[in-house]
Amino acid sequence: RQRQMRIRDRGILHHPEGVDLMPADIQLSGMEVSLVNAMSRETILRQYLDTLKGQYSHILIDCQPSLGMLTVNALAAANRVIIPVQAEYLPAKGLEQLLQTVNKVKRQINPKLQIDGILLTMVDNRTNFAKEIAALLRETYGSKIKVFGTEIPHSVRAKEISAEGKSIFAHDPNGKVAEGYKNLTKEVIKLEKQREKSRTGSIR
């Protein structure tokens, strides 16, 4: 109970599905302007998350699809990055610019930053175009960066339920989108175990 009061005071909400959330709204877009003249503006989020260390085993930072100061803050605070890319032309084209930003943040601000992989999302396998984009991304980046085997399928209903404050697991736990995220979770956990095994081996 004491911990719940502590996190509530920080604007963190406990969701019935078993996770804590710090939700944002449209007002967050104004932070881009506010951060322009802020001291250590690239690491403000990291400084805040440092105060939460020990309370959580994992913290996920969901970024808006832009390369502004908020995204830079997220990259400066993170140790791993999963890059979601819609199976469409423009998002795929913008991937190279995002990768350049990630590498720049790694060089200048956060040397521990690593890319876990690229995740294909909103994939409509009924169209040849989506299949071609997916194949192109795997061919272009697969030799340098892991492209997750999991693909998150397109779902109109998945978009709608986010407005209801529910997750896909609460709405349709046996559906294709939920199955996709379950498979992604397994891939990420496997990566974590491989890293842990590698660290243990290097210590020995």
Where are these regions (language model features)?
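P-loop NTP-binding core
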Residues: 1-4, 8-204
